[in-house]
Amino acid sequence: MEAKRTVGDYSVINSMYIGHRDIVLCENTAAKKGEKYLCCYVENVAVFERYLEALVSDDFAEIVKVFGERVSEAAAEIIKETEQANKEIGSNEEITAKKCKAISYDDSIKDKVVVIDGSHLRPEFRHASRQLMLCTGGFGSDPHSRGRTCFCTCLYDGRQTSYYRSDILGIIEPEELPEWAQKGLQEAREKYEQEKAPNKERGEAR
């Protein structure tokens, strides 16, 4: 049986992770007056959780209203981000297996453009701008590796992140990438090479 999610002394009775926000609605029947219900944001920091902008009330409808407003705001934020990406790059549809080359256990994917499997992303992130990555290393990038983690740089916005090898749908050759992704690939490789360089070389480059 799955353990019930809690936030401190509160039991989570509803939650929604939308965009960049994890929003929870909680109840504590033993709480002091005025604090029976709670709504807050949850952030994961390493192995710990941090609770932000907590509001409490004995009025369930009031807290549900806050919960709904926060979900709506988070959804609006990610809609705006997606619309901006669509405007900048044009076609931003989810990349499927038909559009990339599958990888095997024998393949190295280091310095390859990898496609994150949309089924491993939340629905609002199933777009090419969130899937195309340069794999820069990690034990999971090696052939026949027992490791899983692959370090990646997003070709759309340059953010650095990591995925498991099992999250990767396949690879795409650079010449098959759309123009925006080719530009992002060049920038990602330049940044990676700069970060690899000894400190002295970095200083001279500046």
PLM regions and their residue ranges:
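Negatively charged, low-complexity tracts enriched in Asp/Glu with abundant Ser/Thr
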Residues: 1-15
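Charged, amphipathic alpha-helical segments
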Residues: 18-26
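Short aromatic-glycine-(Arg/Gly/Cys) micro-motifs in beta-strand/loop hairpins
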Residues: 25-53
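A short, charged, amphipathic alpha-helix used as a generic interaction element across diverse proteins
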Residues: 58-73
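Mixed-charge, Lys/Arg-rich low-complexity intrinsically disordered regions
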Residues: 72-122
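Preference for solvent-exposed, low-hydrophobicity sequence contexts
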Residues: 109-115, 133-135, 151-191
